[in-house]
């Protein structure tokens, strides 16, 4: 399962600001603000942009950096098109994970064949799409906002199945989701930084086919 998670996450140590969010459990008073943030994340049916991913492996004190583009397609799933250090394409939907490598070879895993992977995959989709119902069911939620409009959400899994793969998640942004930091089950941080994010651009025929 750790290999499967790495294939998808495949990510810069957490900053002090990120650590601080876990000192701010979600309260009833802040719940409305959180709802507004998550609603904004879900307003666009499609989001696309560029990503930079830094995966830190503490045992060898090394960072692995990759860059590329992404598409988050509402209820359909997520596309990760890695361009560097080598090209690969990953599509995650509710039913499957599909990967295409640089040579064009395709591999696919169906969720029904691996219930644990299916649960982890659906959780990751919910995190990136701002699915409040799923987040409340599966995570302890922490939330804070800054004077400049920056919001930060901290998530700690409730379920042992998820906690073995993802020990914590921190999301932050202004208008759009800008950064996500996941710590895997071994405490290795994985940082995603998003840029050039646009909403409302429809899927291409190829993208649509990959997510169906």
Give names to the regions the model predicted:
Residues 15-19:
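Sec/Tat signal peptide C-region and signal peptidase I cleavage site
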Residues 6-14:
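Bacterial N-terminal signal peptides
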Residues 1-4:
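Positively charged n-region of N-terminal signal peptides that target proteins for export
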Residues 132-212:
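Gly/Pro-enriched, hydrophobic low-complexity segments
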Residues 69-118, 190-191, 196:
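An acidic-aromatic
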Residues 23, 27-72, 77-79, 87-89, ...:
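N-terminal secretory signal peptides
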Residues 20-22, 26, 33, 38-43, ...:
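Flexible, processing/modification-adjacent segments and terminal tails
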Residues 51, 78-82, 97-100, 153-155, ...:
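Short hydrophobic/aromatic-rich beta-strand segments that constitute the beta-sheet cores
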């Amino acid at each position: 399962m750790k290999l499967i998670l790495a294939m998808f996450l495949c990510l810069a140590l957490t900053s002090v600001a990120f650590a601080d969010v876990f000192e701010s459990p979600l309260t009833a008073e802040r719940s409305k603000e959180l709802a507004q943030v998550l609603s904004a994340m879900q307003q666009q049916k499609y989001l696309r942009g560029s990503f930079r991913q830094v995966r830190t492996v503490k045992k060898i004190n090394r960072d692995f950096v990759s860059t590329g583009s992404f598409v988050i397609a509402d209820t359909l799933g997520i596309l990760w098109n890695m361009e560097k250090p080598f090209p690969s394409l990953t599509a995650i939907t509710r039913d499957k994970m599909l990967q295409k490598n640089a040579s064009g070879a395709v591999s696919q895993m169906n969720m029904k064949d691996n219930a644990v992977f299916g649960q982890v995959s659906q959780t990751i989709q919910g995190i990136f799409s701002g699915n409040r119902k799923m987040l409340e069911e599966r995570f302890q939620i922490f939330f804070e906002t800054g004077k400049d409009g920056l919001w930060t959400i901290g998530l700690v899994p409730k379920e042992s199945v998820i906690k073995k793969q993802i020990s914590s998640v921190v999301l932050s942004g202004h208008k759009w989701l800008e950064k996500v930091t996941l710590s895997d089950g071994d405490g290795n941080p994985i940082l995603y930084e998003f840029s050039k994010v646009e909403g409302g651009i429809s899927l291409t025929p190829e993208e649509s086919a990959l997510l169906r």
